[in-house]
Design a protein with these regions (language model features):
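Glycine/aspartate-rich loop-and-adjacent alpha/beta segment that forms the canonical ThDP
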Residues: 213-279
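Non-catalytic, mobile gating and regulatory segments of ester bond hydrolases
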Residues: 1-5
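Cofactor-binding active-site loop characterized by glycine-rich and histidine/acidic residues
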Residues: 17-21, 32-163
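Thiamine diphosphate
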Residues: 109, 113-116, 121-225
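Short acidic, glycine/serine/threonine-rich loops at helix termini
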Residues: 74-75, 103, 153-155, 181-185, ...
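Glycine-rich beta-alpha junction loops
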Residues: 68-69, 73, 176-177, 237-240
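N-terminal capping segment at the start of a domain
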Residues: 9-26, 174-176
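Short secondary-structure boundary/capping segments
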Residues: 80, 187, 247-251
Length: 279
């Protein structure tokens, strides 16, 4: 896909996020929207996957370590063809397979159940090690939140990955600067993030604008060309990206829009999509 096509797809992913969270009357829109461009690039450009064969042995693996942003993952999976887009409206509903956090046993395309912060990266490291030991070529990607990396387990996993030189592993940090309790650097600062990963023998890519498709593409290309080290992509993003009243507002970390707010959000995204079509 070209840049415009990816941008339009990201716009659709955002619409799916807002629709799902509104229908659920609960969920985490802010961090889902900040990572929407990354979800889009992964599922429509980067990952070796097949929606018709979700468990094919040589597929690339993706672990959403910040599992509360499941609406972003679900929207990307639906648009990629893993399940009907209409099912996004059943998010968190009784009897729905689209739970509040990813469930590998019930959701096509989900490689790891997640939600307990810090555990997803550990699972991803195990997958990457398994591929190395088995001589398999698949790659493993995991997306973390910047608040999540306050968890000690993250750094145990990073230490092991760097020590084992797992160059088939890509760790992405969604550095939107906000977590549920406020600005990350005021709650419990993990900065400088880049230097911490470098200390554990990671190749680090500082992604200045994690909502820009050209920069995202360049970051993943650099990761793919890195040998002998795992890669950490530190993606500087905007919490709530794409919805005017949600951008950089910590209150939208874990709150659903009401009917009026939903209409405004969808109008914002409609206008963005129309503007992209005119480019």
């Amino acid at each position: 896909m070209n840049k415009q096509e990816l941008q339009l797809k990201a716009n659709e992913v955002r619409k799916g996020i807002v629709t799902a969270v509104h229908a659920a009357k609960a969920g985490h829109p802010g961090g889902s929207l900040s990572a929407a461009d990354i979800f889009t690039y992964l599922y429509f450009e980067e990952l070796n996957i097949d929606p018709k064969d979700p468990k094919k042995p040589d597929r690339d693996r993706f672990v959403l370590s910040k599992g509360h942003t499941a609406p972003g993952l679900y929207s990307a999976l639906a648009l990629r063809g893993y399940f009907p887009v209409e099912d996004l409206r059943t998010l968190r509903h009784l009897g729905s397979y689209l739970q509040g956090h990813p469930d590998m046993k019930h959701i096509p395309g989900v490689d790891m159940s997640s939600g307990s912060l810090g555990q997803g990266i550990s699972a991803a490291v195990g997958m990457a090690l398994s591929a190395k030991l088995s001589g398999d070529d698949y790659r493993v990607y995991t997306l973390l939140g910047d608040g999540e990396i306050q968890e000690g387990q993250v750094w145990e996993a990073a230490m092991f990955a760097g020590f084992r030189k797992l160059d088939n592993l890509v760790v992405i940090v969604d550095n939107n600067g906000l977590q549920i309790d406020g600005p990350v650097d005021q709650v419990c600062s993990p900065y400088p993030i880049n230097e911490k990963f470098k200390a554990f023998n990671f190749h680090v890519v500082d992604l200045a604008d994690g909502n820009d498709m050209d920069q995202i593409a360049a970051a993943f290309a650099e990761a793919r060309n890195t040998k002998g080290q795992p890669t950490a992509i530190i993606a500087h993003t905007v919490k709530g990206k794409g919805v005017s009243f949600m951008e950089n507002q910590v209150g939208w970390h874990g709150k659903a829009p009401n009917d009026e707010e939903y209409a405004i959000a969808m109008e914002d995204l409609k206008k963005e999509g129309e503007a992209l079509c005119q480019k």
